[in-house]
Amino acid sequence: MDIFRILSRGASLKKSKDVTTDYALPSAKQQQYEQHKEDTLQHQVDKEIDFFHTKKHNSSKSFDSTDSKHTKEEKKEKKEDEEAPPLEIQTVEDSIKLRKANHSKVTGEDIPLPIGSFQDMIGRFRLDSKLLSNLLEAEFVEPTAIQCESLPISLSGRDLIACAPTGSGKTLAFLIPLIQSLLVSSKGRPKNYGITGLVISPTNELAIQIFQELQILTRGKKLNVAILSKQLANKLNNDIVKASKYDIIVSTPLRLIDIVKNEKVDLSKVEQLVIDEADKLFDQGFVEQTDDILSHCTYTKIRKSMFSATIPSGVEEMAHSIMRDPIRVIIGRKEAASNTIDQKLVFTGSEEGKLLAIRQMIQEGEFKPPIIIFLQSIHRAKALFHELLYDKLNVDVIHAERTPKQREEVIKRFKNGDIWVLITTDVLARGVDFKGVNMVINYDVPQTAQAYVHRIGRTGRGGKAGRAVTFFTKEDDQAVKPIINVMKQSGCEAGFSGWMENMTKMSKNEKKKVKHKEIDRKDISTVPKLVKHKRKQREQMIEASKKRKQEETRNALQ
C-alpha cells in the first residue's frame, strides 16, 4: 500500500441520483460504512508510519519467528480492525419483510436468511476484506434482490436454481460466492493446484463480460483467472501454457469440451460450477455439450448454481436431477420481464410495413438512441443494415458471421456512443450488459417467450426505464401469443390492443412448430416490384451473355 498516496488523497464528490443536495445528511448505513473505512485506513496509516517498529502490532521477540506466527498476528489484527457491523437481517420476521419488498419467492429445505447489505456477509461468512473493498470501489454498494437471496445460499454451500429479471445483478450474485469460497478452500494448497472454479455461458460476448467483472473482484488476490479464448485454447493445445496455473476459468461449452477431450484441461477438481443462462444451455443445441462438461466435473463435493432470466419447467426438472437438494429463488414472476420496461406490440400488416414503421418512429421523434434492433437471421440483419444506411443513420450490425474481434470492436463502439443503432440477431440477446440502451425493437417476432424476455432485457437495466417495441404481421399470429402473456405478467396490458388478447391460445404442437421453425418472410427492401423485376431481367441477360461467350470460346478452340 502506498502510504504517501493515502496521505495525499483529497475529497471527492460522487455523482449519484440518491444525493439530492450537497448538504444532504448521510444515512445510518453510509455513516457506518464510512466510519469502518476510516478506522481501517487510520490503522494502515499508523502501521506504515511506524518506521522503527516500536508499536506492539509489529513487535517480535526474535528475528527467527515463523511465518505462521506472523499469519496468526495478522489475523488477530484483522479481527480487531474489522469488527462486523450489526446484521440488518437477524430474524425470520426480518426476512419475510425483505422478501415481500423484493418480490422474492424462495423454496427448499433449511433456507438461510437473506442479507440486507454486503456488510452482513462480514459477520455471517467472514467475507474477505479485499473482496468487499473491490465491491465498494466498483460502486456495488447495495445488494440487489437476487443478490440478497443467492449470496447467503451459495456461501452456505447449497446448490441453487435462480431466476431473476434481466439487468438485476445475476453475474455478481454468482461471482462473489465463487471467489469467497475458493479464497477459503485454496489456503495451504500448492501452487498450480488446478481449476477449482468454472463458469459456463452460451456466448463469447457474455463470457467476456463475466470475465471482466471477475477481474475487478479478484484484484489484489492470489487467484489466477482466465477466459478460454481462441488464443488461450491454442496455447493449451500446444503446451505453451498449463491449465493447472488457473484457479477460475470462464468459457463457452464447445471450446471447453474440445480442450477437455484433448486432455489439456482437468475438471475433476472443480468445486464451484456456475451455469449462466441455464435455459439456453439446457436447450437443444447446447444440452449435450453441457451434459458432457458435467460428466467431467467429478469432484464429490462440487456445488452447482444455475442462473437465468427465464427457467422453463423442463429445465428446472433437469436441474433437480443433477443437483443435491437445491434451493430455488424466483425474483418477480418466472416468465415476466423487468417492470422497468414499457412494452408495446405494433401490427404492421406486412414486411414492407415494418420499414415504414421505423421511418415513422424517426419522423415522430420516438426513435431515441441508443437502440438495439433484433432480427431472426443473419441475412435479414444485413439487409436491414443496408436499408438504414440509406437513411443516414449511425448504424452497425453484429452477427455470428463476423469475427470475434470485429464483434468486440462493434460492441465497444456501441458502448462508447460511436454507434447509435445496433442491428443484431439473438447472438446478443443474452446477458450482455449495455448500460443506457433506451429502446429495443423486435423487427422480427422472437420464437419463444424466453427469447423475448432476454431480447428486451437489453434495456431497462439497473432500475433505469426502457422501451421495447415488437413489430408483427399476419404471419406472426401464432408466435405473438406467448409475448402477450409475458406483457400481461409484466403489467403492460396497455401495450397491446384488445383484439390481440382475444386471439385463440396455442396448442402444444403449435408452440413446438413456432419454436423450431422460423417463419418464412419476404426480403427486407423498399425497392418497388417493377424495379426489382427489371433488375432480375438485367441479371439474367448478363448471365446469358456470359454463357454465349463461353460457348463461342469453346467452339473456336475446337
UniProtKB/Swiss-Prot annotation:
Domain Helicase C-terminal: 340-504
PANTHER family: ATP-DEPENDENT RNA HELICASE RHLE-RELATED (PTHR47959), RNA HELICASE (PTHR47959:SF15)
Protein known as: ATP-dependent RNA helicase ROK1
Gene3D superfamilies for the chain: P-loop containing nucleotide triphosphate hydrolases
Assigned keywords, A-Z: ATP-binding, Helicase, Hydrolase, Nucleotide-binding, Nucleus, Ribosome biogenesis, RNA-binding, rRNA processing
Gene: ROK1
Organism: Scheffersomyces stipitis (strain ATCC 58785 / CBS 6054 / NBRC 10063 / NRRL Y-11545)
Amino acid composition bias (Basic and acidic residues), ranges on this chain: 34-53, 64-81, 538-558
UniProt GO molecular function: ATP binding; ATP hydrolysis activity; RNA binding; RNA helicase activity
Source species taxonomy: Eukaryota, Fungi, Dikarya, Ascomycota, Saccharomycotina
